[in-house]
Amino acid sequence: MADALVGYEKEAGCVPILHPEEIKPQSHYNHGYNESRKSHVDDYSTWDIVKATQYGIFERCRELVEAGYDVRQPDKENVTLLHWAAINNRVDLVKYYISKGAIVDQLGGDLNSTPLHWATRQGHLSMVVQLMKYGADPSLIDGEGCSCVHLAAQFGHTSIVAYLIAKGQDVDMMDQNGMTPLMWAAYRTHSVDPTRLLLTFNVSVNLGDKYHKNTALHWAVLAGNTTVISLLLEANANVDAQNIKGETPLDLAKQRKNVWMINHLQEARQAKGYDSPSYLKRLKMDKEFRQKVMLGTPFLVIWLVGFIADLDIDSWLIKGVMYAVMWLVVQFLSKSFFDHSMHSALPLGIYLATKFWMYITWFYWFWNDLPFVTIHLPFLLNSLALFYNFGKSWKSDPGIIKASEEQKKKTIVELAETGSLDLSIFCSTCLIRKPIRSKHCAVCNRCIAKFDHHCPWVGNCVGSGNHRYFMGYLFFLLCMICWMMYGCICYWRIHCATSYTKDGFWIYITQIATCSPWMFWMFLNSVFHFMWVAVLIMCQLYQIAVLGITTNERMNARRYKHFKVTATSIESPFNHGCMRNLIDFFELRCCGLLRPVPIDWTSQYTIEYDQTSGSGYQLV
């Protein structure tokens, strides 16, 4: 038993890493004793106190202590009962031993560690909380110079890292060998956490260790930790920092011949202007310029497609060449300036460009052909409503869950000490307790209350703060598209010689396409946008009125315990009937005839809230 624990203790530690290339990150194995490993025996009366402690046999332990066993006495391997109870998460035994005089910070084992070190290595948050309540000091170092926060970071115990920092441990604390928690996380933990959590706590990313002067980015490169490299580059880690040998992270990546690391580090250097790139290269590295290109490209493409088709040139060969040139230009722009944010920027650019050219078409081609009072005036009023709702959907707060630094730490401590610091309800990026119905948006990198979805067409999340505006945007957009299609049909009736009743549909299509290719192109755009907007607004209304759920909840209902999911249906605790759902969502009052139930979803953590009975309206 002791040998297994000693092997575990030596698996990772804070000894000076004299030759980093010879040490590889190691996996964390559970070498503690738990119920699943308990052998089936009927009589514990012959067990010694160490074995009884390991397996959590409380009555046997109490019997031996009452018989005179000294709880401070270490075994032959210098391990105390408190150590064994801590590593095996025996909370009741820890309380009992401390009540009988056990020293909470007694050193023991091969690494001369405290029970808190052992609990931290094993990832027992509840035990860490319990020991610290009894006064255990997490800043004490073990025989290898490691404090608890360093152990938690290198073993990937994110919840323990969060708790220790929230309780006052320095996020940049160096162990005896000058390694910070961030360095250990970068070197040993190949996942986003706890690195992401440490970065959220404003850790210093450019500190160097004591022996090699390696920064966290150096250590991530040495470990081939691509996940952490990406996080550190996003956090503006110094890509030109040199270690004691004068090596930068890029030099280390080249030594390891890792193409991915080399490319990303070179791009980061170029983005900072370190390599004196050409003018075109600087433009490519300019994030703001790339964003403008991605937003502007749809304006160019939509115009060129219609403009080339509308040219008074009989030769389709010439037009084909022009389209080929356009395609090459777009290919150049996409390869040079489009990046991972294109999935958000392009849809927004397509929407803005389509509406821009539709309005140009309306005012230039339709203005003199259609009556003002019955057509233009309603169109203009609808446009004002569309612009307002689009602006609110695009720029307003969708329901961002905010908290101060002190509030975040207080939340972490409260959750940990109540046994609920679970990453399913705690966001390690925003460091907040996630309210019910909220979700962290990977695009916006923030937690949104009553999260519905991230909409690239408005460039923002849709949540409790702007969902009603989003529905207004969809409705008025659909009306605008219908007006646009009506305007195209009126234009063809007035300006084009057509014979639909005589020649049929396909001849009619060729007639209107040749009469005004630009108008036909605008009509096709209108039809395309009509289809997705109509489908989206119907889906949204169905979810809001009939199901009482959001898009995120509908897609991930099986992940949430408060939904009852069958093969054909989803039962939502937030569904209070069609009428009630609509009144609450749109906050309809009708001069006081209706009474919606306001809920602050940024601070609602349970499904129990004040929801009055009835149909959702009340006559007064």
UniProtKB/Swiss-Prot annotation:
Signal peptide: none annotated. Its EC number is 2.3.1.225, 2.3.1.-. One of its GO terms (biological process) is regulation of neurotrophin TRK receptor signaling pathway. It is a multi-pass membrane protein. SMART domains: ANK (SM00248). Autopalmitoylated. Disulfide bonds: none annotated. Residues 1-292, 335-345, 391-469, 525-620 are cytoplasmic. Its main location: Golgi. Keywords: Acyltransferase, ANK repeat, Cell membrane, Cell projection, Cytoplasmic vesicle, Golgi apparatus, Lipoprotein, Membrane, Palmitate, Repeat, Synapse, Transferase, Transmembrane, Transmembrane helix. Disruption phenotype: Morpholino knockdown of the protein does not apparently affect embryo development. However, the motility of morphants is markedly reduced from 3 days post-fertilization onwards. This is associated with a significant defect in the axonal outgrowth of spinal motor neurons without affecting neuron generation. GO terms for cellular component: cell projection; cytoplasmic vesicle membrane; Golgi membrane; presynaptic membrane. The keyword Iron does not apply. ANK repeats lie at residues 77-106, 111-140, 144-173, 177-207, 212-241, 245-274. Residues 425-475 form the DHHC domain. Pfam families: Ank_2, DHHC. Residues 367-369, 491-504 are lumenal. It is found in: Golgi apparatus membrane; Cytoplasmic vesicle membrane; Presynaptic cell membrane. The chain crosses the membrane at residues 293-313, 314-334, 346-366, 370-390, 470-490, 505-524. It comes from the Eukaryota. One of its GO terms (molecular function) is protein-cysteine S-palmitoyltransferase activity. It catalyses: L-cysteinyl-[protein] + hexadecanoyl-CoA = S-hexadecanoyl-L-cysteinyl-[protein] + CoA; L-cysteinyl-[protein] + tetradecanoyl-CoA = S-tetradecanoyl-L-cysteinyl-[protein] + CoA; L-cysteinyl-[protein] + octadecanoyl-CoA = S-octadecanoyl-L-cysteinyl-[protein] + CoA. Palmitoyltransferase that catalyzes the addition of palmitate onto various protein substrates and is involved in a variety of cellular processes. Has no stringent fatty acid selectivity and in addition to palmitate can also transfer onto target proteins myristate from tetradecanoyl-CoA and stearate from octadecanoyl-CoA. Plays a role in axonogenesis. This is Palmitoyltransferase ZDHHC17. The gene is zdhhc17.
